């Protein structure tokens, strides 16, 4: 399924650039994109500057983050709300991305050493 089908048209309408983070974890790469001054030594800064422009406009640069791990969902929603207040578009999608349609198992290790499994 195309990710545009997962995001509403209004969420990406007006985006000149769209960064797709497939396997976003906690969304740090999106922070590198939108908040480069907080990460001056990030190796991604040069890549983002090259492809999105060093003087990119965060109002027309958008990010779509795919992350299937439910443990990270609340973090992505908080990040989305923070960016929304600034007028920046960050679309977290609670889904995995892959080339094959076969099921996968997501393993989450807790601080107590327990392992939970989520079939996706």
Where are these regions (language model features)?
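Phosphate/nucleotide-binding beta-alpha loop and adjacent structural elements of enzyme active sites
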Residues: 1-120
């Amino acid at each position: 399924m195309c990710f545009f089908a997962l995001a509403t048209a209004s969420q990406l309408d007006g985006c000149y650039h769209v960064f797709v983070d497939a396997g976003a974890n906690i969304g740090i790469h999106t922070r590198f994109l939108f908040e480069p001054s907080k990460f001056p030594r990030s190796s991604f800064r040069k890549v983002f500057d090259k492809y999105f422009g060093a003087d990119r406009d965060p109002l027309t640069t958008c990010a779509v983050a795919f992350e299937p791990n439910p443990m990270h969902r609340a973090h992505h929603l908080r990040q989305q709300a923070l960016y929304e207040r600034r007028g920046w578009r960050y679309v977290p999608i609670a889904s995995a991305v892959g080339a094959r349609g076969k099921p996968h198992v997501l393993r989450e290790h807790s601080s107590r050493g327990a392992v939970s499994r989520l079939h996706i």
